Amino acid sequence: MKSYLLVPKESIESQARVGPRGTEQGERVLSRTTALRFAVANKAPDTLFALGLRSATLPGSRPPVSGQEERRRKGKGAKSAGTRGADASTPPMPGATVAEQTGAEPGSYRYMPLIGATMAHFYEDHTEKEARGELERDFEFIPDVVPLSFPGPVSAGQPGPRNRGMSSLAEREWPDESGVPLAHAQGIRGAGVMLGILDTGVDADHPEHAARVIQFRYVSLFPNSPHNPARDIRGFDPDGHGTHVCGIAAGVHHGVAPEVDLYVASVIESETIRTSLGRVAAGMEWLLHQFSRPENSTRPAVVNLSLGFPLMPPPGISEADYNLNLRALQTMIRRLLDSNVLPVVAAGNSGPDTVGYPAAFPESLAVGAVDFERNVATFSASGTVGRRGVPDIMGYGVNVYSSTERRCNNQAFYERMSGTSMAAPYVAGIAALYRCRAPDLTALEVRDLILSNAVKLPRSGTHKTGKGLAVFR
């Protein structure tokens, strides 16, 4: 089986661009429009459906097929049925694809219109060849072969108190200089803001999260069958990383923005601590689908991504395929920003003179880590991409206290963990507070506000610290 993300060439950069940062007004050059629409994007699902691939387009129904493509589908369907040994005299089953009629399945696909891409899985080489013949002029076929992962906590963590009253933790954990205690005292706690998390999941029954309704989706490696679509279930997290991230940003007892509406897509496997471009794309599509519902379409949103590509192409992956994956990921990050969603991204834990993606993309608000004494963490990644320094901003990311998944005795568990994975949700929470106070500001204006209000940090000889420590003012 071969898997590809099909992205219209007109919507993807010819190379990962450095962007306009580095000038005073450079940030505002980035697009402020709503989600981009490319007419050619519909061609991919139409063609794949005509070739007999199974549709797994969320929420499980086949996409509409245009009149021209419908005629082509019927012609190709009859030909394909003949080559697969179907009885030409047998009338087709209503609404059934060639694969369902013959028992053969040449592949499956997931159309993601909000990010303008289609994930295709080919089980037969000749079907892939046909698809390329139809689509390669207009689409990049990006092989889904480069693993993404979260930077991982730097330490295993220190246990905290279990099942203890947590009402005052926010004031104890977040220093006065962060502005969090003052914001909470003023009633600014994130209400009305949507916060998306792409991670390992969330323990929805943990005391930090049990009192709220969490929109949760487990994103599988392969698309769900349209006859057995993904179920909406209570959030779970077999690893704990996602639960810790959610607790920092939005825990009801000690989160930075405890009243946000939480949307969690589980895209990282706990066993391998890996994900793929296709799963991240499906997670972003699900988030944008939730954010664009009629009741949500005018509400502000923030997305936290404590994940990234390896710094170099992994063994067995060509530099060309690696760069294609980068370009596709940048296109997806840009979709968030174009949809007025602020993407907050962990810079990574590989130390100075290292810059990873998506943190290095100009569309991302890249976050490094400091401790509670404002000292830069030795593990915090930093570097330069073109004229742009990374990270953009710093957040508390050393020994940060938050929730983890419950243990087998069903006791709630808390730990202190370190990493830019912890610093990013702190900044995402700060962004949610700003968007709560001023919901009419655009995502770019909120980013400008975070950068302009940052607390300056002492110059470091080894690390870049961006504009300083993110705070709420």
Predicted ranges, named:
Residues 252, 268-363, 373, 408-424, ...:
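Substrate-binding/access-modulating region of protease and related hydrolase catalytic domains
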Residues 1-10:
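Short glycine-/aliphatic-rich beta-strand segments at the starts of folded cytosolic domains
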Residues 11-13, 126, 147-149, 200-204, ...:
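Solvent-exposed loop/turn segments at secondary-structure junctions
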Residues 22-28, 32-33, 37-39, 43-53, ...:
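Active-site core segment of subtilase-fold serine proteases
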Residues 5, 119, 194-197, 247, ...:
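Structural recognition of the beta-strand scaffold that forms the well-ordered cores
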Residues 199, 218, 356-436, 440, ...:
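Extracellular S/T/G-rich loop segment that most often corresponds to the catalytic His/Ser-adjacent loop
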Residues 58-64, 68-173, 182:
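Autoinhibitory propeptides
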Residues 108, 296-307, 436-473:
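C-terminal subdomain of the subtilisin-like protease fold in secreted/lumenal serine endopeptidases
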